[in-house]
């Protein structure tokens, strides 16, 4: 490569994040920013990085899609037997991060994770396209397989078995992260970025500005 990675840089300055304009409730602030990311037609504004830590204390990350949020927390769906599922079972502390590059914004969320109810998982599973529902059966997520043919053979087998109405596998469902910390980052000029952190203390959200 002729171009040095160290020379890659970008100036920020599209917007600002001030305490006077920011919501006192971080969920409302998140709702506003996510809505703006969707309105801006960003590619997959619902994509978020999920960080978990296993019993070996090694962290791992992956991209998942937010499928719902309210005062109870942030929801996504996945395979419970996957690496992330096993890590969450052993250590429910996790972190999420949204990065909306075009808006020069990042949102970080930390908290404890638990499974959503079977009713919530069933309702979302039944709303998915048929191929996705078959795929939940066909993929032994995070396991070593001999080749892609294994997945295709599994998909054909389960497709023939369940036809148009595959039930939700017991190893597949939703998780909800209940936030106890939020951080909103807005890129600013001269690397003097805006960072507002919300932390739960005494049952209330405390908002603080952090140095960038």
UniProtKB/Swiss-Prot annotation:
It comes from the Bacteria. It is an enzyme of class 1 (oxidoreductase). Catalyzes the oxidation of either pyridoxine 5'-phosphate (PNP) or pyridoxamine 5'-phosphate (PMP) into pyridoxal 5'-phosphate (PLP). The keyword DNA damage does not apply. FMN binds at residues 62-67, 77-78, 83-84, 141-142, 185, 195. Belongs to the pyridoxamine 5'-phosphate oxidase family. The keyword Flavoprotein applies. Binds 1 FMN per subunit. Keywords: Flavoprotein, FMN, Oxidoreductase, Pyridoxine biosynthesis. GO terms for molecular function: FMN binding; pyridoxamine phosphate oxidase activity. This is Pyridoxine/pyridoxamine 5'-phosphate oxidase. Homodimer. Pfam families: PNP_phzG_C, PNPOx_N. Pathway: Cofactor metabolism; pyridoxal 5'-phosphate salvage; pyridoxal 5'-phosphate from pyridoxamine 5'-phosphate: step 1/1; Cofactor metabolism; pyridoxal 5'-phosphate salvage; pyridoxal 5'-phosphate from pyridoxine 5'-phosphate: step 1/1. It comes from Verminephrobacter eiseniae (strain EF01-2). It catalyses: pyridoxamine 5'-phosphate + O2 + H2O = pyridoxal 5'-phosphate + H2O2 + NH4(+); pyridoxine 5'-phosphate + O2 = pyridoxal 5'-phosphate + H2O2. Substrate binds at residues 9-12, 67, 124, 128, 132, 191-193. Its cofactor is FMN. The gene is pdxH. Its EC number is 1.4.3.5. One of its GO terms (biological process) is pyridoxine biosynthetic process. InterPro entries: Pyridox_Oxase (IPR000659), Pyridox_Oxase_CS (IPR019740), Pyridox_Oxase_N (IPR011576), Pyridoxamine_oxidase_dimer_C (IPR019576), Split_barrel_FMN-bd (IPR012349). The lineage of its organism: Bacteria, Pseudomonadati, Pseudomonadota, Betaproteobacteria, Burkholderiales.
């Amino acid at each position: 490569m002729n171009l040095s990675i160290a020379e890659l840089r970008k100036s920020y300055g599209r917007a600002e994040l001030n305490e006077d304009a920011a919501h006192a409730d971080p969920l409302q602030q998140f709702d506003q920013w996510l809505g703006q990311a969707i309105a801006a037609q960003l590619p997959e504004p619902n994509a978020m990085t999920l960080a978990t830590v296993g019993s070996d204390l090694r962290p791992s990350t992956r991209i998942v899609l937010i499928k719902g949020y309210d005062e109870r927390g942030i929801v996504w769906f996945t395979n419970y037997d996957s690496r992330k599922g096993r890590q969450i079972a052993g250590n429910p502390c996790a972190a999420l991060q949204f990065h909306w590059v075009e808006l020069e914004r990042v949102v970080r969320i930390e908290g404890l994770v638990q499974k959503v109810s079977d009713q919530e998982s069933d309702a979302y599973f039944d709303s998915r396209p048929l191929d996705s529902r078959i795929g939940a059966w066909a993929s032994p997520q995070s396991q070593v397989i001999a080749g892609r043919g294994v997945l295709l053979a599994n998909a054909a087998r389960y497709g023939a078995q369940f036809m148009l109405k595959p039930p939700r596998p017991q190893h597949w469902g939703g998780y909800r992260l209940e936030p106890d910390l939020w951080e909103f980052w807005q890129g600013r000029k001269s690397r003097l970025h805006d960072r507002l952190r919300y932390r739960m203390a005494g049952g209330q959200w405390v908002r603080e500005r952090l140095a960038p």
